[in-house]
């Protein structure tokens, strides 16, 4: 219920699109299990297309002139149709949960797991609130056992979760945001850095980027831990990598799973 309330509070109408996406995925996954290979692929493509269409239409096609040039009167204020869509229709975390449910569909299609028979579990997987803001993008086989196991109030989990959140806030607010001031000064539009200044700027930017992303993920993981639900670690000290491939694996460990989409044939 907390996840539904979170999505509803962020966008009342947006909750409808979350439910619509989860219904498409739930029905498609069940159907994929029951049909032959040719029909499986058609159902997969149609369901993926439906989910992506909702995402692309609300987030990107709303920028077309047909939406930006038309105004509506909302609560006494005149707003462009594009502004109405962005403010009232787009669900929070739409890009994240769309990629997440597509990974679930692909796992069912490839036979890596059985389709979930309980719709409410699919819906909760779609809109579990801590990861909607910044990820991480989780596979159903990894997140479902954490979501649907029996949960009890555990002060150890709460203590660990709060510590993780404080560590995340420290990295994001006291390191990333502070270093960002110097990075902006070095790479200001009217300034072209050279030599040592440019190298210092690049190093500072790398630290800022890492602390910003990893700090945000730590806050999310910490909030989830308070409920006894563990989320996968998304950053594993990438700057200690010995190769570019290892750097990529350590930098965004969950995003590499979404790269499987590129291998679909």
Task: Write out the residue ranges for each language-model feature.
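Membrane-embedded transmembrane alpha-helical bundles that form the catalytic cores
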Residues: 1-265
